[in-house]
Amino acid sequence: MTIRSPEPEVKILVERDPVKTSLEKWAQPGHFSRTLAKGPNTTTWIWNLHADSHDFDSHTNDLEEISRKVFSAHFGQLAIIFVWLSGMYFHGARFSNYEAWLSDPIHIKPSAQVVWPIVGQEILNGDVGGGFQGIQITSGFFQIWRASGITSELQLYCTAIGALIFATLMLFAGWFHYHKAAPKLAWFQDVESMLNHHLAGLLGLGSLAWAGHQVHVSLPINQLLDAGVDPKEIPLPHEFILNRDLLAQLYPSFAKGLIPFFTLNWSEYSDFLTFRGGLNPVTGGLWLTDTVHHHLAIAVLFLVAGHMYRTNWSIGHSIKEILEAHEGPFTGEGHKGIFEILTTSWHAQLALNLAMLGSLTIIVAHHMYSMPPYPYLAIDYGTQLSLFTHHMWIGGFLVVGAAAHAAIFMVRDYDPTTQYNNLLDRVLRHRDAIISHLNWVCIFLGFHSFGLYIHNDTMSALGRPQDMFSDTAIQLQPIFAQWVQNTHASAPGLTAPNAIASTSLTWGGDNLIAVGGKVALLPIPLGTADFLVHHIHAFTIHVTVLILLKGVLFARSSRLIPDKANLGFRFPCDGPGRGGTCQVSAWDHVFLGLFWMYNSISIVIFHFSWKMQSDVWGSINDQGVINHITGGNFAQSSTTINGWLRDFLWAQASQVIQSYGSSLSAYGLLFLGAHFVWAFSLMFLFSGRGYWQELIESIIWAHNKLKVAPAIQPRALSIVQGRAVGVAHYLLGGIATTWAFFLARIIAVG
């Protein structure tokens, strides 16, 4: 008798043709909601249409259907990203001076946009060098193209076309995986398989592919460019890939092929996989051989990580088991029940991912200037400032988004019956202690950090400089930060074996990298002024966290409104007859959190902009004397509020205010226009709904008088809608004002 092993069960993971493709249905506005599909009676309809069109939770309660919509939407998002990237590369190919910049990146500035003369706009086309007239760009694309080994505009064309093809594929995939072969819920909930594929596939193989490209294409091309070879003389990428002898001329270990790899003699490859530290003195960017080594190491780590989770075989980790095993002496049931949250609530997943991605984006902002990854990035001050500012803003928005979705999870997806005495439940039960302590911390930080400035302003005003907190009077040196800097600067070998220099020049030492007479990077001194402003950072960040965390922890209930969960994520007040219960919804906390996020990030980017202009950026003459843009005035001037207003905001706004009649005049107009947008927001934020409803009714009366009354009845925005429009314009106006101020300044002086 033969005993057969049981036949493996084939899991059916997709459903065929679940939703028919119907253009008629899509053409009907509001098709996803019975109420909205009836069409508009009042102007509120258009607002609700925008508010709910992507709120898949409100379309259906079926988790599988919601998951499919989210999955499909992600492909749409990727398509948009590919179209955007294609546009960037197309501008580089069609309208830019990339090839000229590549031949002389020190004297020629990047430009990829030429303004058409219609009513005299050609004034905006400034001279960027090399006889090219255009708008100076600060996105960093030229630098990243050079680092990837792009040597001609034809290559940019090809990449742009490739990106469009990928965009089409993504759109097709989004349609296919919703209408033709939609995954089942079990597929979305198979977290181990998802982890394995994302870690090994996206991060592991993605990094490996990039490392391979860097080794075979970027390194040799950049090596030749650094040596001053004309880009047109450099062999094309496929020649390096197909002809090993070409590479061996630049990196001798290539002649040995894979023998050192299989004989574990890996140090043979140290001519193109290095641990040098510091910056390449020719380009002022990280050594590309270091970044290749980094991507190879990342690839190895993630390829290993992508084999750690248990799927079809009975080996490997199970996320549920890991979570449930985490019980400490003071944590009750630990993480029991958390796995179920993460597999049934997309909002909970999204909240975690946004919090981590937001933090990571802010870390990226700080690394882009301290370890500039691309050639000639460090001496392009406009791009340095733009990249820092951009990544800080994005990080701030993502972190607020994390709180928003955490609160939506609490309101819509949290089931108190399954969460008993685990960590989430315990946090919710002692939320009063958390919030009241955090509130105390905010008050302490606010009074003490701002108090130090007010003390300085008072002493300065009374003519008593010797009684101020500054490097030349009462010193408050950031000794811990200086210790961290010193440790890194004095012992680079602790970071990596045989490292020649520390990870970043900013740590200290006497190293200075200048490219073409401009400072790329040097050790950044920290003093009393930095100590003061860092405590302002601590204050604003803690207040942001207080508002957002209170919104999450009190999203379902509070002493004031015990049944808050029944009112939903956003509601104006707890009904008539309950005064003093307005603006308490989780949505309102996100609304308020956005303002404090804006405060936090503004002070960070102001600090960065002034500090770099004062202590890092500038020119260096043949004698080695550095002339900083603002002459090192940060340490003395920024210790008073008056100094920030006078020597930063006012002094540095002169370029944007005086830009009319020059190629920077667009920034002057933007500065004015964005101030207007910002001021417009106050109209929504400072007035109540009733005021507008009353006004609208008298306007309707006038229309009726003239027999031109509209069929769709006009109504004032709801309270929540008004606040949403207000905060959107506040942020848009504020960010665009800052953008114009920064760029006009840094392009003029940088």
From Swiss-Prot:
One GO-annotated biological process of the protein: photosynthesis
Q: What Gene Ontology terms describe what this protein does at the molecular function level?
A: 4 iron, 4 sulfur cluster binding; chlorophyll binding; electron transfer activity; magnesium ion binding; oxidoreductase activity
Q: Which reaction does it catalyse?
A: reduced [plastocyanin] + hnu + oxidized [2Fe-2S]-[ferredoxin] = oxidized [plastocyanin] + reduced [2Fe-2S]-[ferredoxin]
| Compartment(s) of residence | Plastid, Chloroplast thylakoid membrane
Pfam families, per this entry?
A: PsaA_PsaB (PF00223)
| Main location per the UniProt record | plastid
Residues given in the record as [4Fe-4S] cluster binding sites = C573, C582
- Chain residues that bind chlorophyll a: M683, Y691
User: Which pairs of positions does the record mark as disulfide bonds?
Assistant: none
Which UniProt keywords are given for this protein, alphabetically ordered?
4Fe-4S, Chlorophyll, Chloroplast, Chromophore, Electron transport, Iron, Iron-sulfur, Magnesium, Membrane, Metal-binding, Oxidoreductase, Photosynthesis, Photosystem I, Plastid, Thylakoid, Transmembrane, Transmembrane helix, Transport
**NCBIfam families associated with the record:** psaA
Q: What is this protein called?
A: Photosystem I P700 chlorophyll a apoprotein A1
Q: Which organism is the protein's source?
A: Psilotum nudum (Whisk fern)
